[in-house]
């Protein structure tokens, strides 16, 4: 890949300094002065770039690798060509993430779009009653309503709408085109482009002439270190709050219904829809395009396979998949049985046609 102007290389760090900083073992002390400026995949990494491997599947690519160093665990060190030093770590994936963030800090959250001479653009609207702590940046066309409180170091992107009385913590980034209503955000929260936070939930009751709208007077509570992907929507509660727990990461185009409570350090992949009033524990991982029924409980540490349909409670510490979602071993057994039946049917159909 040619020079990337969006994320230019770092001015350079020595391999020995990277190893010392993150507690990794450098396989060749003589390579400690080598300068690393960026990261890249194994197949195209150059001498000033780091790459990483997690399995022996990368062995063939390593034969022609030109990387400045390869991050791996001790069990895979033997795969690394002798001319390339290894950075050995018990958690190579984590180390790669840490080094990447160090080399490319601007890629860790949405960047400023406008070149600004002042912290608050004259093309933005900030209500006189709003309180902005020092260092808040507000880009053009943003609208900040009455009674809003925004913490120090937070960046508000172009075209963002922040409704009245919303509170946003410190060192947050609200990217262009997002809207935040009836919400309280903690510190170090990232909201990506086009996300919608705090609009009313989908609540209706049957009436004599059709559907009657049910009042939605709850809030959205987003705790510290949460990241919300582009075009994701999080509805405010009906009467209670919708809550996103500390450290949870939500991908693009996820729908979270009213009154949902998601625990700490969960991962929710794109296309997931979570219906109202569902409770999700800590450390839960939900694969892409999964549908989650309302008014159910998913326990701590659950893993749900992509494109599943979760219709009832899921016990803590389990792995579920399929439609309807069931324990993974049952799902895999059922799939094997279905495939075997299909093959048998095809075989019989072929014999009949050939007869």
UniProtKB/Swiss-Prot annotation:
Catalysed reaction equations from the record: a UDP-3-O-[(3R)-3-hydroxyacyl]-alpha-D-glucosamine + a (3R)-hydroxyacyl-[ACP] = a UDP-2-N,3-O-bis[(3R)-3-hydroxyacyl]-alpha-D-glucosamine + holo-[ACP] + H(+)
EC class of the enzyme, as a word: transferase
Family matches, as NCBIfam families: lipid_A_lpxD, PRK00892.1
Annotated Gene3D superfamilies: Hexapeptide repeat proteins, MurE/MurF, N-terminal domain
Description of how the protein assembles with itself and partners: Homotrimer.
Keyword Ligase among UniProt keywords: no
PANTHER family from the UniProt entry: UDP-3-O-ACYLGLUCOSAMINE N-ACYLTRANSFERASE, UDP-3-O-ACYLGLUCOSAMINE N-ACYLTRANSFERASE 1, MITOCHONDRIAL-RELATED
Function comment: Catalyzes the N-acylation of UDP-3-O-acylglucosamine using 3-hydroxyacyl-ACP as the acyl donor. Is involved in the biosynthesis of lipid A, a phosphorylated glycolipid that anchors the lipopolysaccharide to the outer membrane of the cell.
Gene Ontology CC annotations of this record: membrane
Involved pathway(s): Bacterial outer membrane biogenesis; LPS lipid A biosynthesis
GO biological process: lipid A biosynthetic process
E.C. code: 2.3.1.191
Family: Belongs to the transferase hexapeptide repeat family. LpxD subfamily.
Active site: 258
Organism of provenance: Agrobacterium fabrum (strain C58 / ATCC 33970) (Agrobacterium tumefaciens (strain C58))
Protein name: UDP-3-O-acylglucosamine N-acyltransferase
Record-level Gene Ontology MF annotations: N-acyltransferase activity
Keywords: Acyltransferase, Lipid A biosynthesis, Lipid biosynthesis, Lipid metabolism, Repeat, Transferase
Bridged cysteine pairs (disulfide): none
Protein's UniProt keywords contain Transferase: yes
């Amino acid at each position: 890949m040619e020079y990337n102007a969006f994320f230019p290389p770092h001015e350079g760090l020595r391999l020995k300094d990277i190893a010392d900083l993150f507690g990794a073992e450098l396989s060749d002390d003589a390579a400690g002065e080598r300068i690393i400026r960026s990261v890249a995949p194994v197949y195209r990494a150059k001498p000033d770039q780091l790459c990483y491997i997690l399995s022996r599947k990368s062995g063939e690519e390593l034969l022609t690798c030109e990387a400045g160093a390869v991050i791996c665990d001790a069990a895979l060190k033997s795969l690394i060509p002798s001319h390339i030093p290894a950075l050995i770590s018990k958690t190579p994936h984590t180390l790669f993430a840490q080094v990447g963030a160090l080399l490319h800090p601007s890629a860790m959250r949405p960047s400023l779009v406008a070149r600004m001479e002042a912290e608050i653009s004259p093309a933005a609207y900030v209500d006189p009653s709003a309180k902005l702590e020092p260092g808040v940046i507000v880009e053009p066309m943003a609208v900040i309503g009455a009674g809003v409180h925004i913490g120090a170091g937070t960046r508000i992107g172009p075209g963002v709408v922040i409704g009245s009385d919303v509170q946003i913590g410190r060192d947050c980034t609200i990217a262009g085109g997002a809207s935040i209503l009836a919400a309280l955000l903690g510190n170090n929260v990232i909201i990506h482009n086009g996300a919608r936070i705090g609009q009313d939930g989908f609540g209706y009751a049957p009436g004599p002439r059709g559907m009657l709208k049910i009042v939605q007077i709850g809030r959205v509570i987003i705790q510290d270190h949460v990241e919300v992907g582009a075009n994701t929507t999080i509805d405010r509660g009906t009467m209670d709050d919708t809550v996103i727990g500390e450290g949870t990461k939500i991908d693009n185009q996820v729908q979270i219904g009213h009154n949902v409570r998601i625990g700490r350090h969960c991962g929710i992949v794109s296309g997931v829809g979570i219906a109202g009033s569902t409770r999700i524990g800590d450390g839960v991982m939900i694969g892409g395009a999964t549908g989650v029924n309302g008014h159910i409980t998913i326990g701590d540490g659950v893993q749900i396979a992509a494109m599943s349909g979760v219709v009832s409670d899921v016990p803590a510490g389990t792995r579920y998949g399929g439609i309807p979602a069931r324990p993974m071993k049952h799902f895999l057994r059922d799939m094997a049985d279905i495939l075997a039946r299909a093959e048998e049917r095809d075989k019989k159909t072929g014999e009949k046609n050939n007869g």
